[in-house]
């Protein structure tokens, strides 16, 4: 059964078994993206128990945090006369403008207190350069500045990545596509994600991921 608000898979995967070559990437499960947050993703809190459950089967877990400066270039408030969810052309490409969110050191930028993943090994903070956004856990939106995650994973001989979190159509999708570009087999755990879906972004994200070779899976199909 597909959770409400999720598009039907374009490229699904059969059940897979987790082993020592696998890592779970938990993307941006932060207070700003949860109910009551400044950029709340609809039903975003519903991913938390799913992620907690599947994380128990992974020895290798990486988490990410959006970590913006005040006045970040992705904020609508930084562009006079612009409103959230409008777009602007910046030097690195088209940028969706967002409400102020995940500002460094604020409670909104904190990871959900309900996450229970004590074995998480690494937290990647992204979007901390004021003049460029960063959806992906691997590469900033300029397509050049890397976070070092790919090298970290490869040094540990991790080859298969499972991506969960918020939001499906932005940080999850960009992370999954960049994971494929870096040579990793990549799955998105559909029921462990939720999307924003602005101007058709969710359907486009799934199509882009399928084109890149990213596979979809449900949490029930992951065998530890």
Where do the PLM segments sit?
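Glycine-rich anion-binding loop/nest that anchors nucleotide
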Residues: 158-174, 188-194
